[in-house]
Design a protein with these regions (language model features):
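N-terminal Sec/ER secretory leader and immediately downstream segment
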Residues: 1, 12-14, 39, 45
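Low-complexity, acidic interaction segments enriched in glycine
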Residues: 19, 23-168
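N-terminal alpha-helical signal peptides/signal-anchor transmembrane segments
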Residues: 3-21
């Protein structure tokens, strides 16, 4: 559960990074610096509509518009994770000294460029403490990893089920 929680924290940080910078971050240390020192705008959005005279149709018509106003800024770490969050712990795979692997890019899906990212933790690293006890299981998944996001598909979901962790 610790690994998947950290993957989800990185996903939330990536989404905040993209909202502020327009693209996902490809360097995990840059993402940590953003969480540590970055700020997120607090935006108030109001949908409004008004009537106007349309010369083509020669009648009153309704026009919808959106008004946005920046109310202030808040530190990324506080906004996403609350006070007392340790940004440096976010990048380490629990129980090891290894770091998560992170990449970002763009793909073209249906003639639209879509920003993508992928964060992964190899099974061999995550389960290093029990790997010797179950060698047959690890031979089957030697090159696989717990992953969130994808560099080939426009998704930010993970390749794992987190139902056990959510029920606690």
């Amino acid at each position: 559960c610790d690994v998947t929680e950290k993957l989800e924290n990185i996903r939330e940080a990536q989404l905040a990074y993209k909202s502020e910078n327009g693209a996902f971050c490809s360097d995990i240390n840059e993402l940590v610096a953003f969480v540590d020192t970055g700020v997120i705008n607090i935006i108030e959005r109001k949908d409004t509509s008004f009537m106007y005279y349309d010369k083509v149709y020669q009648k009153e018509m309704n026009k919808d518009s959106v008004m946005q106003r920046v109310l202030g800024q808040e530190p990324v770490a506080v906004q996403l994770f609350g006070d007392g969050f340790d940004e440096q712990s976010m990048i380490r795979i629990p129980g090891t000294d290894s770091l998560f692997t992170m990449n970002a890019g763009k793909i073209n899906k249906n003639a639209v460029d879509v920003a993508t990212f992928e964060v992964s933790a190899p099974y061999a690293t995550v389960f290093a403490d029990v790997q010797d006890s179950y060698p047959q299981a690890f031979n089957k998944v030697a090159n696989e990893a717990l992953t969130i996001g994808s560099l080939t598909e426009p998704t930010i979901s993970g390749n794992y089920e987190n139902t056990y962790c959510k029920s606690e």
